[in-house]
């Protein structure tokens, strides 16, 4: 199969992303924030993607490639790990059974088959097992397929300092275009000694991709001509029979390329009895950021040669699809460019990618179904899904009429870009557009036949709604305002079908104005905010965020940060907001990624002064640091935990006094006065036990601890159970802790520096926190974590994406878990319903 699919269209919030797919390999074009999850929703297999080609150095083009490369690397790692585990099991079996306890092995064999020879077992050699499994066992990562990146000039600047959080060696597989040599050159961004040869064009067994680099005032754009390898001629039995040839050895000779002479002397070759080879059916992806780039493309020498070849022999150089990407519609909607489009031929599909005409957002059916079920259990905790007017409208509302008019007058086929739409090019009998399970807006899905069928399938399931209990309780609580918490992502490692990676949004009010804090910002966090709140509320949230704190360097906690900063930057510019010297956001990150964040802001943020980046240790109450920083300089990816250093005194009174004294320091008092003005709470970091420079956080309001209006929210980040976080999170109103693993996987949790569900609950209970909420679950729990009676007995809340509550609602919020778990179990256990989610 050979196909072209649009993963994301070019809207005001996303750049175009698409993929060319063959049976055994794929080629990705652009990879923005959220592309990984959208690709996952569409069933794209990451491991097949050989290369990524970028149209631009804009952040929306490439921000998602870190997470994509790490996920893809993890899949490679899993392959290697499986080999290693297989080897370990073989060695373990042989060494334990034959070396340590040969009698036990003999007894086991006797039980299985008493008639077998009971002669003593001989020791087995381990070495032949290694030889049999092959060299990959010795170095299982050596031959794994890597993914190569190709971008415009200066593209490598975007990846400076990424080695401190991205374990994939990007430097070895990153090529940027060199205008002076007209070739892609591998960039030595981490000072490697060996350089691969420059690449004029990309070619492999499936495809040839020709780059076209355009420059105007140092704004570079890359366009790509993608030419698949032409299929060979195929032998046609009927044509051979028409010449009077009989089936048998003659057919075999012809298929080998030999000739056959007929009785009348006519010579028959393979060409005479074969179907014509299928045309190459090229795909062109053209990016035109300005009118000047458009003019340069039309007169470009490479493009002119290609079009001439296509006109000279359209059968061989056939063009199937041309994608036209432009930020403004008038760049491509003009007489000059439309004439250029007509040169490609009348059977070409022209896809217009422009924010002024495209739909704003894409929704996955499975994700909407889960939210629908959660909403049925509690509309208070999982409010009604917001239908934003913008999601089904484009700025240019009469685009269909415009497209029809252009098509009619110029005999060309023009269509809008729809995410999830795939154009099947080979085989010819399946040629055409297909789209499955994806909807241009929430309203499209909830009015669809698919949703009506889903409702019918679950109509016999009794769904208990807990809202009456919560509403009755809320009438009797303190009317003073308490913070509102929303979980934007609740899984670990990488985005999955029903959950995104970690992010928590905390809303507080100051003088009746809503202000926001973000704890962690995994890939796709911006997309999650839009899905939860709609476009208009999202704008208000972004303009009122006052603190973003990142717990540690791992991608599932920080890869969405730059996208959030960029969207805030775009809003400030578009709304012409004038900033004073006190108008800025605190961006608090560990030192391991501070240079990367500062470099990203310097490269692509215009309102730079609005973002003040601080090292997490600035707000670390505990003067004792658990990591040997002098060792980290030479080994940035290793853990060096100084276990000899003691945790602080666990006496709550002493800790409270210590925190207060820390905040009163002259150099810190400035910060804390500003915190109260900006978001009405005090903020501190706490070093925890995960990778180097890992932190938990806590925020609290500035009232007496025994006051009914006092509140405190603690967040563990990723961590093993440790006294440091235990002590500083004491007496939290809301204690948020990671629960990556089930209690049966204590060994895995210890090895990977995480906590189990049971460990997290014990910490929260023992340090006298009022309410416990768990998050950061393993991807194996993609829909729901299996319910345990303990959760109900201890009032433990486990978060799903978009869980939202005021602190005073926590006394009953845990009650949603059991009915939701019952719904999922009812669906999973019923074979007729098993595949409806």
Regions found by a protein language model. Give the residues of each.
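Binuclear metal-dependent hydrolase catalytic cores
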Residues: 1-314, 320, 326-715, 720-727, ...
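P-loop NTP-binding site
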Residues: 315, 321, 766-767, 777
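An anion/phosphate-binding loop that grips the pyrophosphate of nucleotide cofactors and donors
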Residues: 732
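Histidine/lysine/aspartate-rich catalytic loop segments that bind and position anionic ligands
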Residues: 737-742
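A short acidic, helix-capping loop that chelates divalent metal ions and anchors anionic groups
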Residues: 743-748
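A structural motif corresponding to the C-terminal end of an alpha-helix
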Residues: 762-772
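Conserved strand-turn element in the central/C-terminal portion of the radical SAM core barrel
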Residues: 770-783
């Amino acid at each position: 199969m050979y196909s072209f699919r649009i993963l994301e269209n070019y809207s005001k919030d996303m750049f175009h992303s698409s993929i060319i797919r063959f049976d055994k390999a794929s080629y990705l074009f652009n990879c923005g924030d959220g592309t990984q999850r959208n690709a996952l929703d569409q069933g794209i297999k990451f491991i097949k993607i050989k290369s990524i080609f970028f149209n631009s150095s804009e952040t929306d083009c490439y921000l998602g490639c870190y997470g994509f490369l790490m996920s893809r690397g993890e899949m490679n790692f899993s392959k290697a790990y499986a080999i290693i585990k297989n080897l370990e099991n073989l060695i373990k079996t042989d060494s334990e059974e034959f070396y340590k306890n040969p009698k036990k092995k003999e007894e086991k064999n006797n039980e299985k088959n008493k008639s077998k020879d009971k002669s003593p077992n001989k020791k087995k050699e381990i070495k032949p097992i290694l030889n049999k499994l092959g060299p990959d066992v010795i170095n299982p990562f050596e031959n794994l397929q890597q993914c190569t990146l190709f971008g415009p000039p200066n593209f490598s600047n975007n990846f400076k300092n990424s080695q401190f959080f991205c374990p994939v060696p990007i430097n070895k597989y990153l090529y940027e275009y060199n205008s002076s040599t007209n070739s892609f050159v591998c960039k030595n961004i981490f000072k490697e000694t060996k350089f691969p040869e420059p690449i004029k064009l990309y070619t492999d067994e499936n495809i040839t991709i020709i780059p076209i680099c355009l420059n105007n005032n140092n704004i570079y754009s890359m366009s790509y001509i993608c030419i698949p390898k032409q299929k060979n001629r195929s032998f046609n039995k009927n044509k051979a029979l028409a010449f009077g040839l009989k089936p048998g050895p003659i057919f075999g000779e012809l298929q080998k390329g030999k000739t056959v002479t007929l009785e009348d002397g006519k010579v028959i070759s393979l060409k005479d009895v074969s179907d014509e080879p299928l045309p190459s059916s090229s795909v062109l992806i053209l990016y035109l950021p300005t009118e000047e780039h458009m003019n340069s493309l039309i007169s470009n020498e490479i493009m002119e040669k290609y079009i001439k070849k296509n006109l000279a022999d359209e059968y061989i150089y056939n063009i199937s699809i041309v994608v036209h990407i432009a930020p403004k519609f008038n760049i491509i909607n003009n007489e000059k460019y439309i004439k250029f489009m007509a040169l490609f031929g009348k059977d070409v599909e022209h896809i217009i990618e422009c924010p002024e005409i495209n739909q704003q957002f894409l929704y996955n059916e499975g994700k909407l179904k889960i939210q629908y079920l959660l909403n049925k259990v509690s509309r208070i905790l999982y409010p009604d899904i917001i239908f934003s007017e913008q999601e089904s409208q484009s700025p240019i509302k009469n685009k269909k009429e415009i497209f029809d008019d252009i098509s009619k007058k110029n005999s060309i086929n023009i269509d809008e870009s729809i995410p999830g739409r795939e154009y099947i090019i080979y085989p010819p009998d399946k040629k055409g557009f297909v789209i499955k399970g994806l909807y241009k807006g929430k309203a499209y899905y909830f009015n669809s036949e698919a949703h009506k069928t889903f409702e019918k399938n679950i109509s016999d399931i009794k769904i208990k709604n807990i809202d009456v209990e919560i509403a009755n309780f809320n009438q009797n609580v303190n009317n003073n305002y308490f913070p509102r918490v929303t979980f934007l992502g609740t899984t670990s490692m990488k985005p999955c079908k029903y959950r995104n990676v970690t992010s928590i949004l905390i809303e507080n009010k100051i003088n009746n104005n809503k202000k926001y804090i973000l704890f962690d910002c995994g890939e796709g966090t911006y997309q999650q905010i839009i899905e939860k709140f709609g476009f208009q509320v999202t704008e208000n949230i972004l303009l009122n965020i006052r603190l973003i704190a990142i717990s540690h360097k791992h991608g599932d906690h920080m890869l969405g940060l730059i996208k959030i900063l960029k969207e805030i930057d775009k809003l400030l510019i578009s709304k012409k907001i004038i900033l004073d010297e006190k108008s800025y956001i605190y961006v608090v990150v560990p030192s391991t990624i501070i240079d990367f964040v500062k470099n990203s802001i310097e490269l692509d943020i215009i309102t730079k002064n609005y973002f003040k980046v601080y090292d997490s240790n600035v707000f670390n109450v505990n003067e004792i640091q658990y990591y040997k920083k002098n060792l980290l300089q030479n080994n940035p990816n290793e853990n060096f935990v100084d276990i000899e250093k003691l945790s602080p005194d666990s006496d709550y009174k002493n800790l409270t006094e210590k925190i207060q004294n820390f905040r009163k320091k002259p150099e810190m008092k400035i910060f804390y006065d500003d915190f109260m003005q900006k978001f009405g709470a005090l903020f501190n970091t706490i070093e925890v036990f995960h990778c180097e420079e890992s932190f938990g956080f806590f925020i609290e309001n500035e009232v007496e601890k025994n006051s009914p209006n006092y509140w405190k929210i603690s967040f563990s980040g990723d961590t093993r159970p440790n006294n440091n976080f235990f002590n500083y999170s004491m007496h939290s109103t809301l204690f948020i802790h990671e629960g990556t693993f089930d209690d049966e996987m204590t060994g895995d949790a210890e090895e990977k520096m995480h906590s189990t569900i049971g460990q997290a609950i014990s910490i929260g209970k023992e340090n006298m926190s009022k309410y416990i909420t768990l998050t950061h679950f393993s991807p194996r729990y993609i829909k729901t974590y299996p319910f345990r009676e303990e959760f109900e007995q201890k009032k433990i809340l486990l978060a799903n994406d978009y869980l939202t509550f005021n602190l005073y609602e926590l006394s009953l919020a845990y009650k949603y878990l059991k009915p939701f778990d019952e719904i999922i179990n009812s669906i999973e256990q019923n074979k007729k319903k098993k595949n409806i989610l």
